[in-house]
Design a protein with these regions (language model features):
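Ligand-binding cleft/hinge of the Venus flytrap
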Residues: 67-77, 158-223
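Sec-exported extracytoplasmic/periplasmic mature domains
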Residues: 67-75, 98-102, 111, 118-122, ...
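N-terminal segment of the mature folded domain
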Residues: 39-174, 315
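Extracytoplasmic/secreted proteins, especially bacterial periplasmic and envelope-associated proteins
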Residues: 57-64, 68, 92, 96, ...
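Extracellular/periplasmic juxtamembrane helices and adjacent flexible linkers that interface
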Residues: 3, 273-354
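Ligand-binding pocket segment of bilobal, Venus flytrap-like solute-binding proteins
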Residues: 192-257, 265
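Short, low-complexity disordered leader/linker segments with a strong preference
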Residues: 1-47
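Short helix-loop capping/hinge motifs at secondary-structure junctions, enriched
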Residues: 149-155, 174, 187-195, 272-280
């Protein structure tokens, strides 16, 4: 299936020619970019290195995706592309890029983090329209991990508010996954007919049960699994699926409805790719994330594919839930301002829960 990125002319400049990138289902991963025709035959572009800055739980997937893209890009264009990657809490990664970490591509836990980089002048407006599904190649949801046998009888969202339950959850100030945890908890009330007041009281009760707030999703998992802290862990569904596939641990987990369908966008960092001359390869890499081979890798590593073809290929792999989106909660801009702005809901809940 071929498509023409609608905003590509904006990224390359008003006078630049539009370039169609085609995806095929199996035989080839990327059709040869038209830009390659401008280079004299037999003279591929010099080798380039791309830096991906992403959130903590994507590493296993990208360890497989990098060589897939590099091999196909080499075959199609003759150019050698290598990768470096930085993994960490999405909020911390966002600040690092704004502060000067020279990412060519970011794949972050939420659109609001990408918007912060845009507001800093590093990403051009309109990035959401660059690729399908608001430039979001994968989804996930929030899982509730319990101890074997579920001794605390955690069978619904409401059970997290029991006073004898000790919860491990990452810090929403540093972790994108933690903000999704918070959104899932809030929406479990409001998307089920409850009021903001009821949601506030519920979340306060939950976070009173949180003893420590690790900086990111991976550290939260280590706290629960390796250090045996807590009765319950709130984390990505991705973490459970990946860990089981790799045989690292088999902690039981539950998925409750309604739940939030998390959306993790990817895009190029315009100022950096233009300065470094890596735009062509960086944009192709982001588009590659939406191809069937990349979607299959994401699914194998616990991410819910975002594309129709990816979803069809992964049918039966993921539990069906009643989902709501951050859009149902007002969108990230409004939700962040209300909940994570200075003096917002989270600051008040944190102060009262300590």
């Amino acid at each position: 299936v071929a498509y023409l990125p609608s905003a590509l002319s904006r990224r390359l400049g008003a006078g630049a020619a539009l370039v169609a990138i085609g995806f095929s289902g199996s035989a080839g991963l990327l059709a040869p970019p038209a830009l390659a025709q401008a280079r004299k035959p037999g003279t591929p572009a010099p080798p380039q290195e791309l830096l991906l800055v992403t959130y903590a739980v994507t590493k296993a997937a990208y360890d497989e995706i990098f060589p897939l893209f590099a091999a196909d890009w080499k075959k199609r264009t003759g150019q050698t592309v290598t990768f470096k990657a930085s993994y960490g809490g999405s909020g911390s990664q966002t600040r690092a890029v704004i502060d000067g970490l020279e990412a060519d591509v970011v794949h972050l836990a939420m659109a609001s983090d990408v918007n912060r980089i845009e507001k800093a002048g590093l990403i051009n407006p309109g990035w959401q329209r660059e690729n399908p599904h608001n430039s979001t190649p994968v989804n996930s949801t929030v899982a509730v991990f319990v101890r074997p046998g579920n001794p605390k009888k955690i069978n619904s969202w409401a059970d997290l508010n029991n006073k004898d339950v000790e919860i491990v959850a990452a810090n929403p100030k540093t972790s994108g996954g933690a903000r999704w945890n918070y959104a899932a908890l809030w929406g479990s009330v409001t998307e089920n007919g409850g009021t903001d007041s009821a949601a506030r009281a519920f979340i306060l009760g939950v976070y009173k049960n949180v003893d420590v707030l690790p900086k990111d999703a991976r550290e939260a998992t280590d706290t629960f699994v390796k250090r045996k802290k807590g009765d319950v862990l709130l984390n990505w569904e991705t973490e459970a699926i990946l860990a089981r596939r790799k045989g690292e641990w088999t902690v039981p987990y539950k998925l409750f409805s309604p739940n939030v369908l998390t959306e993790q966008p990817a895009t190029v960092v315009d100022r950096n790719v233009d300065r470094k001359g890596t735009r062509r390869a960086a944009e192709a890499f982001v588009r590659f994330l939406f191809t069937p081979p990349a979607q299959a890798v994401f699914a194998k590593n616990g991410f819910r594919p975002a594309t129709p073809a990816g979803k069809a290929a992964a049918r039966g792999r993921f539990q069906q839930l009643k989902f709501f989106t951050i859009g149902d909660l007002g969108g990230w801009d409004a939700f962040d301002k209300k909940h994570f702005g200075k003096g917002g809901e989270w600051d008040q809940i944190f102060r009262r829960s300590r």
